[in-house]
Amino acid sequence: MTMTDPIADFLTRLRNANSAYHDQVKAPHSKLKANIAEILKREGYIADYRTEDAQVGKTLVVDLKYGPSRERSLAGVRRVSKPGLRVYAKSTNLPKVLGGLGVAIISTSQGLLTDKQAAKQGVGGEVLAYVW
């Protein structure tokens, strides 16, 4: 069976592994998922990520991050634009997640950017996910 929304699958794997206090999560690799992981690492939601060569294809391994007393650094993830309903935002109308405490991941013509980076560069695009 084919996967209709690989980004939602990746975000769900992150959410479930984080809720179960796993140290790492594995997902099928793609450039888009690696870019999402790079944004999450840069914003401090995950510890690290790497690509491993498997027998069939590549695997993206994400090391999750927790606080000193095992509190989650990734409180929530929500997929916004879906294959059945795409959501776009102009550069003047970019979404704020929890009043600026969270991050919106936006696919732009300059690549994947956070809402703050997109506003600074003056570009809009497809709103992929909210992370807080």
UniProtKB/Swiss-Prot annotation:
InterPro entries listed in its UniProt record: Ribosomal_uS8, Ribosomal_uS8_CS, Ribosomal_uS8_sf
Keyword Flavoprotein: no
Keywords: Ribonucleoprotein, Ribosomal protein, RNA-binding, rRNA-binding
Pfam families hit by this protein: Ribosomal_S8
PROSITE patterns linked to this entry: RIBOSOMAL_S8 (PS00053)
Gene Ontology MF terms in the entry: rRNA binding; structural constituent of ribosome
Coiled coil: none
Subunit structure, interactors included: Part of the 30S ribosomal subunit. Contacts proteins S5 and S12.
Task performed by this protein: One of the primary rRNA binding proteins, it binds directly to 16S rRNA central domain where it helps coordinate assembly of the platform of the 30S subunit.
Family classification: Belongs to the universal ribosomal protein uS8 family.
PANTHER family per the UniProt record, alphabetical: 40S RIBOSOMAL PROTEIN S15A
Annotated protein name in UniProt: Small ribosomal subunit protein uS8
Provenance organism: Nocardia farcinica (strain IFM 10152)
